[in-house]
Regions:
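Non-transmembrane, aqueous-exposed alpha-helical and coiled segments at domain scale
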Residues: 1-145
């Protein structure tokens, strides 16, 4: 249900096939692994504006596997079937973030959510996009400098 709402808000459908993309809350466990394996030095968060007006937001911070909480992903496909996400919940915001180009102008709850994402992933934010226009971007760390 949440994934479908996010998909509709963000118009997440294949450009060629029109097939719906899988959407859901950010998986910090997977993100931390991607950061470690790939040497990622900065995150680019896109479509922040589609979260406007949501009463609350979640981040998966661990998995529950056979009753035990783990911050590591299972190594096999069967393990995934037996995992439950453990979520950290954040308050949403009602203010629009669409088109904002300065960090300080984001709603406080949006900044708190993004800072938590940064802290939990262990990777700094580089860019936050706040809409479909190229100019609807907050550059925190220029990845091309």
């Amino acid at each position: 249900e949440t994934g479908e709402d996010i998909r509709k808000r963000g118009q997440e459908f294949g450009a060629t096939t029109g097939r719906p993309r899988r959407c859901g809350w950010i998986d910090i466990v997977a993100l931390k692994r991607a950061v470690a394996i790939n040497g990622i030095s900065g995150l680019c968060i896109t479509k922040l504006d589609i979260l406007d007006g949501m009463p609350s937001l979640k981040m998966c911070i661990a998995y529950k596997y056979h009753g035990k909480q783990s911050e590591y992903a299972p190594l096999d496909a069967q393990g995934w079937d037996q995992c439950e996400p453990v979520y950290l919940e954040f308050p949403g915001w009602n203010e629009s973030t669409a088109g904002i180009t300065e960090w300080e102008k984001l709603p406080p709850a949006a900044r708190a959510y993004l800072r938590a994402l940064e802290e939990l992933s262990g990777c700094p934010l580089a860019i936050v996009s706040t809409g479909p226009d190229r100019d609807a971007t907050i550059i925190l760390q220029d990845p091309f400098a």
